[in-house]
Amino acid sequence: DHFMDRRISKDLDVEVFGLSMQELESVLQKFGKVHAAGKSFGVLKLKTPTAEYDFSLPRREQKTGKGHRGFKIITDPAMSFKEAASRRDFTVNSMGYDLLENTLLDPFEGIEDIKHKKLRHVGPAFAEDPLRVFRAMQFSARLEFKISAQTAKFCRKLDLSELPRERIFEEFRKLILKAKRPSIGLSASKQLGVLNYFPELKALIGVPQDPKWHPEGDVWTHTLMVLDEAARLRTGIEKKDMVLMFGALCHDFGKPLSTKFLRGRWRSPSHDTDGIAPTLHFLQRLTDDRDLIKQVTSMVKEHLRPIQLFNERDRINSGTIRRLALRVRIPDLILLAKADYLGRKLTKKERECFEAGDWLLAEAERINVKDEGPRPLLMGKHLLKLGMSPGPEIGNILKLAFEKQLNGDLQTNEQAISWAKSNYPDL
């Protein structure tokens, strides 16, 4: 971080040579509370009133079985720094600083790779954890480094099929939330062989688009551009940004299924709804976060609506927008639609304004559904209070009342109750 002029992380990792685990623990206890939860991995955490630090002993890993848990940790205080650094993933992460000698330790020429903006693996130990392929993907984007040809070739040989989805998801999370240009990492995923494990992404490559609307090229190229535009629209609120960025990544998953050459040009008439199934399949292999999956699939399904509604604004009523607000949060949808709109080759003037989004946001604010969908005015408790007996008829009345509310015919609780009384005289 120092040599790349990046913000220095508050998380400090200190590797200690020449002390046993017991000796290290004894020394650290003089400065604060020591947590030994990572002791079996050769790591101790020191907590002081002002900060937390990770102290570790040099270690080597002995493979004992398959998967990322199939190894045994052996600490060795007598190990040289070069040998300890040889098990790191990339040369830029293999450097150290000798606090006693006040010198940089760089046995694998990480500084040279930083100068040339190159991401290069340290050595054969890279293969010990195939997750490093995904780390290459997200690091290449966050650092905006080019992956060396030798590293890419090495990555393509590794088996990624046994990696737990939680670990893969974390690398995707870092890619889409921390990189200014996530497209660099997505492009790298093609080079690294990652796309072989994600057919929904691979299917985007080569899918044609109408050059009138998409002069940038195929769906893959468009998706890369949309991803970068979405990154510029991130809010800093992680949950919202996750939905936006995964929505950008998945928004055109339906195009490989729906694209046809019709009436003289390439069209994808149902790609919004066709994208739901591949989006579900993709996300369920990454996470069990049902709320995230639900929100992203809804965004994919509705991503065309802002422009569609704007084009039909003289023919639609406010009920259409109220119903949309029940399915997605409108400001979030507008961000995705804006990224989709901007993710093309546009003139400077065309980029200045997303008129459809501005219009929809103003309409949503006007009818009070900008922040959430409308809540029913008439509820079961009102009908029971009016003397109606519990039963399925209550549900039918409430459903009809809510439809009238969405259409704008009922706007207050009093109007809703009055409507129920006048239409159901037995109440």
Segments the model singles out, each with a brief description of its role:
Residues 1-427:
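Catalytic cores of the polymerase beta-like nucleotidyltransferase superfamily
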